[in-house]
Amino acid sequence: MVHMAEDKQDVGGAESTPPSILAKAFLVIGAFNERDRVLTLTQISRKTGLPKSTVHRLLQRLGELDVIEEHGAGYRLGIRLLQLVSSMPVDGMREVALPHLAQLQAWSKESVHFGVLRGNEVVVLQALFAVDHARPIGEVGTRIPAHLSAMGRAMMAYLREDELTELLSGPLVGITPKSITDPARIHEELKQVRVSGVAVQKDGVVLGLGNIAAPVLIKGRPMGAVAVQFDSSKQVSESVINAVKLTAHRICSDTTQMLAQGRGDLFPFDD
């Protein structure tokens, strides 16, 4: 599902062309996350790979725009970003999903996630972590190849055939020795998802960890997916499977109700 290496927000190929000023600015913004809310110039330079002089100039300009602000001896994201984020359509999905994710996390005592499909990747929109996790895995904004993710497969199972063909046509990267990258095997697993209503992955992203996910379907289309993390050495209980499916169903019901109330602008998916 949603597991990442140290200080990485994307899993995939590296950019081959030199980054533009805009790209560098986004690198600086992307250095911040739920774990690193305040960073020094040196920390930002180390995380982005940019020279300190470049980071300093970018921080000055972003500060003038209220995108970044000083905080003690470091920096944090500014109020302008909050204003922009609050106007994003995906924020409506997070609003609907959050109370149901909270119930699922409180019941399961495991980390839970809600993600959406963007191209050939899953993007984590909401994450609630188990209290005993020393390091959160799968923070908000994390991206992972859809074919490796339980959430990704849960949504892929309900794509149109042409969409699925396009998604699987490119190079399918693996992260661990147990990552599934064979298109034929992925197709077979997607058939099972349509029968069972859930997708399961074990050890495909991080050895020792697995996830079970259920899609949130609106008008037959995958709007998002809910996932629960578990120890891959253990079997997933029927109660967990049912809880994940019920959570996805509740998010679907609330979303359908909001659409009926004319709030379709919050949910950017096809009719």
Locate the predicted segments by residue.
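N-terminal helix-turn-helix
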Residues: 2-94, 252-253, 257
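Short, solvent-exposed recognition segments
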Residues: 6-8, 133-205, 271
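Short amphipathic alpha-helical signal-transduction/dimerization elements
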Residues: 33, 152, 156, 160, ...
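Amphipathic alpha-helical effector-binding/dimerization core
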Residues: 76-170
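Short loop/turn motifs at secondary-structure junctions and domain boundaries
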Residues: 106-107, 203-208
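Juxtadomain coupling helices with adjacent low-complexity linkers
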Residues: 196, 207, 223-271
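Short hydrophobic beta-strand micro-motif common in sensory/regulatory domains
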Residues: 210-214
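Sensor-regulatory modules in signal-transduction proteins
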Residues: 216-218
